[in-house]
């Protein structure tokens, strides 16, 4: 079972590239983007994943403008054997230049949503800390992820209007991840497992001449499982980004977080992240949300279009909803990203704060 990538010297096992190194049913490979205006007037998200052992390739595109509805396109198909085939019906992703430029196209379809967008990077690729989570003696997540910060150029149309996306304004975050992650239909059979929980917070932020990045996985009692903070140079154009700039990434000793929530919700009203240097210096970043995006619009915790679930040989769907009118404590609505204004007391910037938590003891709500 060969595909086009087998012509490159990239193999990590004796098998062709189509064969995963693990037989875990939840092995996956994912491409994800966001894009947003610094003033919080709009936000859009993009996702595509292949789940080889589930036989699924799925995608989503979702856009929201301030004080308007969020519009969502979903697509799913039988996973192709050819890994360079990154298309689901009217949706496709084209890697124009690896680690630099990616095109995303959603052609005319029944949702009334379409786009033609080009991402171009403004940072080197940034590899995050390894993300390994356990349930007893079993790894339920084991993933590598890298990020890039950049810009978008192109157009978006949705049922409530059109957006002209200009790279002089529109900021972008890209992440690529692969490994094992629990998705799709839940497993059945076997002995019941003990309840646990997770708290996740991610803050990719733009400043004038650099980016800052922090990621947190905490356990049900607030114990740190994964924590990382870093900074890296931000370039004015894609052409200025060096091919080999990994040494320019400055990893901090660690990071910490504090989140204040709107009463009776799991939606952040404000937050702070501390980047703690190797010299014990502390850079405190204060974040103020200005726009909310519901991650179920990309399939996360969606009751019908959850990632990795079998929908059929080729299916597409769509929906629109007002994020302000949703039940904030419904399971499908507690995963969100918020565009945030940020300040460290000397500099100001903008970025995104993502969070989700399912925990037995809600220690940070007390």
What name fits each language-model region?
Residues 1-366:
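Structured soluble/peripheral alpha/beta segments that form catalytic or ligand/cofactor-binding pockets
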